[in-house]
Design a protein with these regions (language model features):
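Short E/K-rich amphipathic alpha-helical oligomerization segments
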Residues: 24-51
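Long amphipathic alpha-helical coiled-coil segments
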Residues: 64-80
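Solvent-exposed, non-transmembrane amphipathic alpha-helical segments
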Residues: 38, 52-56, 77
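Short, charge/polar-rich alpha-helical segments
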Residues: 1-23, 55
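Charged, amphipathic alpha-helical oligomerization/scaffolding segments
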Residues: 20, 24-27, 52, 56-59, ...
Length: 80
């Protein structure tokens, strides 16, 4: 029972972190779109931030899905 609570709390924290990172990524994404619309090369810094935030978001989503699958598996087997 405690393990299930712990996993749910981890999932909640990861979701909050993803939301925070998506907000930050949106800023760099807006700068990239602006550069494309103005037909200029985007700033290297904006590209770097966008790629860094996207990579971190993808990593966290993978971790969150693994935790959710663990909860489902434990629920099916009657564990936890």
């Amino acid at each position: 029972m405690f393990e299930k609570f712990k996993i749910r709390k981890q999932i909640k924290v990861i979701r909050q972190r993803i939301s925070f990172l998506e907000q930050k990524r949106a800023r760099s994404q807006a700068a990239l779109v602006d550069a494309i619309l103005r037909k200029v090369d985007p700033a290297d810094e904006d590209v770097e931030y966008f790629n860094r935030f996207t990579g971190e978001i993808d990593r966290l989503r993978t971790e969150m899905h693994e935790l959710e699958n663990q909860l489902l598996k434990d629920k099916k087997t009657g564990k936890v």
